[in-house]
Each structure stands twice: as structure tokens, then as C-alpha cells.
Amino acid sequence: GLPFTQQMTFPCELTLRTTAEGVRIFRWPIDGIRKLYKKSHAFTDMTTVSEANEALSEITADLVDMSITFKPIADAIITFKVRGLDITYGNSTEFPNKDGDMVTVPSVEFDNIEDEKPAIKIPAPTVDGAVSLRLLLDRMSLEMFVNGGAYAAASYCIPTTDRIEFSVSKGDVLQVDSLVVNELRSIWKEEYAENDGTAPEVTDLNAKDVSMQWEKNLPYLEEAYISAQ
């Protein structure tokens, strides 16, 4: 097998910030992603899973930038099912503290697409009693940012639906302080966007046409990337 997955992540800024654990590097998507927003859905002060799922029921999203701030529930697993992918909160992982000692902290995780490998976990401690989680979901890519970028992870994935829904292992209570779901448009121009944003398949017969399409779209892609900086 190859030593890489060919996954491409969205451009991010790395910043140094002083935290209770000392100086840390934060990773956060560049603001240019806002140029790709085509529709936004915002909700606040929801108190049950039923309420959250009702709010989400009308949203069908292919490309997603979702942010949620919620209050954890003791001894309960919270599952955010985004396009068929389970992102769970409520288990734990080990992470070094400011003294370098390994400590147990709450985690957020999702299954590794390679079945023989363990789930991908990152720390997700509470800040003032709440956890903030941001998910960027492309057609075959998932990026996760916790507490403003204090912790981050990325992996390739295979979404199976266009829906978003939540669940809790105990009861129906779920305090969601804020939830924002931004639907994203494709970076490709209309020729590709109408084909679900994917480039046409390359064959011996159409290789020349595909090459011309790439040349036609290259200035647009370069402009989009530069404007996102």
C-alpha cells in the first residue's frame, strides 16, 4: 500500500496561543472558506435531541462546514451523524499536560475508514462547561477542529447520505448552545459543478478535452485560492 491517502485538507492558519497548558499551536480554516458558503442555517439554545433533529430535518447537504457548541452529559455518548458518518463524544483518550504527564481527557472520535485500524481520537475537554466542535466534510474528506482549533484531526471518508442527525445514549436531553450548518458550493466552475463538482473521467478518447477543461479552469482555481488567503 501507499504511505499516504492522497487526501487534501482545506487551507488552515497555524497560530501560537497561550493556554492553561502553556503555549500551544492552534489550527483553524482560513476565513476564505466563507466565499464558498451558499446557504447557512443557525440555531441556538436547543435543549433536546428531538428539537435539534427537527431543526436539522430540512437540511440536505453535500459539502458541509458545521459548528456546534454543546454541554456534555455525564456518562453518556453523544453521536453526531453527519452524512452517515458517526462522530462521537463521551469516551476518553490520553494527552500530555503542561508538565508532560499523560492524563485522561474526554475525546471526540470517528471510525477509521480502514477497518483494521482503531478509531481516530482527539482530546475534547470542556471550556467553561462546554465543548466546541467544527466539522468540514468534503466528498471524501473529514476535518475536525475542537475548541477553536486547540485540537484537530483529518481523514479521508466515504459519506453515505446527505442528512445530519444527533443521538444520545441516555434519554433525550442535549443542551446545544449554538449550531451552525453552512452548505458549501463547489470550487469548480459550472461545467464541473453540474456534475456534482467532480472532474470528468479521463479516457484515451477524451483526454485532450479534459486537458483543455483543466487549462480553462486553472485561472479560476488560482484566483479562488489567492482570494481565500
Stretches with model-predicted labels:
Residues 1-228:
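Beta-rich accessory regions
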